[in-house]
Amino acid sequence: MPCRGLHSIPAGPVEFPEIATVYVMCGEKLTVMIDAGVSNSIADFSFLDKLDYIVLTHLHIDHIGLLPELLQVYKAKVLVKSGFKKYLTSEDGLKKLNESAEKVLGDLYYVYGGLEKKLDQDKVIEVEGNEEFDLGGYRMRLIYTPGHARHHMSVLVDDFLFTGDSAGAYFNGVVIPTTPPVIDYKMYMESLKRQIELKPKVVGFAHGGLVSPKIMEEHLKQMLSKEEIQINVDIGGVAGEILRKQIEVNLRGLRESKKSI
């Protein structure tokens, strides 16, 4: 039976699958995946009868890890911000991508896993971040949202906004800045405000799942606060330790970015 509608799939590491979410929108014409999880994931995509595009919100390893596996199964094209295809399709680019991730994430790099092999040139298409696609029953628009990364894009499908890491994360009722080193604080804030102005009905976080758009507004207030942000989320066990380490990375990046303002 053909896939239809929106699907939300946990695609984090086996110790904490819910830390990363991949979204699939199945239209009558096209099926699109938003991000590709971590390489150490056991995410199940077997319900998909086809896959036309994989939109990468950005190239951090927790969003691209399953690309080689997915492209072995499906004849999909990968959409990435213009100027950054080389990091997926060359040995030198792949090395830089993984080394940068290890430097920022520390032990978490080995929990998530890196991108294990480069992709074929013809599998990756560069986009500017303002393209539109008719999925058949749904209209998809790419939106350039730099700040978290220079190559960050969000995806608007009708009234559903998929923000990647450009508008925060959300676990156990707590909003978490998605601000690891090296972010551009000013651009991050501009992208966050611009997405709030879109007035989506539902927001899909890459870390935290589907949430109310009010969470983005809460995150904006959090980021504008004069006080240093403190995050306390205790979910226990190995998953709790992974989340704690990721929060530490994000808050470190936020502190460093504010020094340059």
Swiss-Prot record:
Coiled coil spans: none
Gene Ontology molecular functions: zinc ion binding
Top-rank taxon, per record: Archaea
Positions with a binding annotation for Zn(2+) 1: H58, H60, H148, D165
Keywords from the UniProt entry: Metal-binding, Zinc
Binding site for Zn(2+) 2: D62, H63, D165, H207
InterPro entries noted in UniProt: Metallo-B-lactamas, NDM-1-like, RibonucZ/Hydroxyglut_hydro, ST1585_MBL-fold
Family as reported in the entry's similarity comment: Belongs to the metallo-beta-lactamase superfamily.
Matching PANTHER family: ACYL-COENZYME A THIOESTERASE MBLAC2, METALLO-BETA-LACTAMASE DOMAIN-CONTAINING
Subunit structure and binding partners: Monomer.
Name by which UniProt lists this protein: Metallo-beta-lactamase fold-containing protein ST1585
